[in-house]
Amino acid sequence: MATVAATTKVPEIRDVTRIERIGAHSHIRGLGLDDALEPRQASQGMVGQLAARRAAGVVLEMIREGKIAGRAVLIAGQPGTGKTAIAMGMAQALGPDTPFTAIAGSEIFSLEMSKTEALTQAFRRSIGVRIKEETEIIEGEVVEIQIDRPATGTGSKVGKLTLKTTEMETIYDLGTKMIESLTKDKVQAGDVITIDKATGKISKLGRSFTRARDYDAMGSQTKFVQCPDGELQKRKEVVHTVSLHEIDVINSRTQGFLALFSGDTGEIKSEVREQINAKVAEWREEGKAEIIPGVLFIDEVHMLDIESFSFLNRALESDMAPVLIMATNRGITRIRGTSYQSPHGIPIDLLDRLLIVSTSPYSEKDTKQILRIRCEEEDVEMSEDAYTVLTRIGLETSLRYAIQLITAASLVCRKRKGTEVQVDDIKRVYSLFLDESRSTQYMKEYQDAFLFNELKGETMDTS
């Protein structure tokens, strides 16, 4: 009798590729400085602007040492000279532990809250509080879990949990909630777990090495750890880092913590903030908390009006003020809300408090290097001649325009089944998409055909 072997079809497993969005400054990893705060010509995505990066490195070092809280720095320069890039480099160099808040000057204007409230919230987002607390935990390897269910099917479950370390073994009685937590986390014999005595939270650390041969096959997420040594009950110091704004929101209303996720914070009363400041100061004196002055970055700062600048003057003198970094591309222009002109559109009394860092236009060599970095970031292969043409376009028009042509040229190259962007691809997208100067020239030629044209033979100011 012939037997037919059943064949099982194994489904094909495909690797899921994580896609990350490519932003204008996603290639920046830091300021590109060495240990002596000397900038390298091209490092960590930063190119050129050596003097500005050196100055930013000095500011960065003072922020790390906590010696510059309440100071303000202005990065001033022409459009497309890397002002925002320097600020983003500082944020990357500071790391995740130091709060960094970035806003645009026009973000503070809202119908829902006042300008000063928006600035206050931005300031308090940029100040972190590192709170230390000691908790008692039980850490050990699960030897056995016994759960007794009532014979009638009704009533509460009871059980026993046996935990061990290399030196001791103990049996714990379990209540209904702990049994539910163990079942939910799928805890079984051989798992190494920790139980927070205050909250009852159970955390799985992994499987014990002694149980490595229990199963023939295990998933890639299975982690093996050593069996804990010493006592089962231990005291552990836990550090929480939150911003002052998060504490404000939680204490401002009954369901304040929900507002953190919805973003509907509204205006917060000054009395609430004063109470929180007093409590944080008390924790600081007792050694329970530590203040971390962070960084608030305001881009396009010339968009603020005279009332906002007046508020900044006062806020910088506060004992809980972050480092304020501002960027502007304006020269001598009118202060918003007044008829007076001032350098960068900022009042003189605030300019007097600022450390001003200037940026200069990129050279041809730097422009070419930046375009190479952007091509690597966007996975675009380009010929040397195409780099030269694109660099010339960047120098004659703007660096931003040249960077935007990279993706468009790559798409044109793929459509013709090419693997490397050539000069013809650059020329084609250059003819399809106008830059600012060619667009202005086009409008001047056909000004009578446009609706509501106000030029009337006058020279158009495009500065």
From Swiss-Prot:
MF terms (GO), sorted A to Z: ADP binding; ATP binding; ATP hydrolysis activity; ATPase binding; beta-catenin binding; DNA helicase activity; promoter-enhancer loop anchoring activity; protein homodimerization activity
UniProt-listed GO biological process terms: cellular response to estradiol stimulus; cellular response to UV; chromatin remodeling; DNA recombination; DNA repair; establishment of protein localization to chromatin; negative regulation of canonical Wnt signaling pathway; positive regulation of DNA repair
Position of the Glycyl lysine isopeptide (Lys-Gly) (interchain with G-Cter in SUMO2) cross-link: 9, 444, 456
Positions of modified residues (N-acetylalanine): 2
Major subcellular location class: nucleus
Reaction catalysed by this enzyme: ATP + H2O = ADP + phosphate + H(+)
GO CC, one annotated term: RPAP3/R2TP/prefoldin-like complex
The EC number(s) this enzyme carries: 3.6.4.12
Pfam families reported for this sequence: TIP49, TIP49_C
PANTHER family referenced in this protein's UniProt entry, alphabetically: RUVB-RELATED REPTIN AND PONTIN
Name used for this protein in its record: RuvB-like 2
